[in-house]
Amino acid sequence: ALQDDWQQSHLERRQVLAESQKQIQATIGALXXERQXXA
């Protein structure tokens, strides 16, 4: 049971990490696009 709990929280953490990573990529993409438009 303990192992299952650990795996579950581990998976959730990885999902949260992936989400924030996508969030960062989107932000960087938006900034880069704005910079190109302004240039």
UniProtKB/Swiss-Prot annotation:
Localization of this protein: Gas vesicle
Disulfide bonds: none
Cellular component annotations (GO), alphabetically ordered: gas vesicle
Major place of residence: other
UniProt keyword annotation of DNA-binding present: no
Family: Belongs to the gas vesicle GvpC family.
Role description: Confers stability, involved in shaping gas vesicles, hollow, gas filled proteinaceous nanostructures. During planktonic growth they allow positioning of the organism at a favorable depth for light or nutrient acquisition.
Identification of the protein by name: Gas vesicle protein C
Organism of origin: Spirulina sp. (strain CCAP 1475/10)
Gene responsible for this protein: gvpC
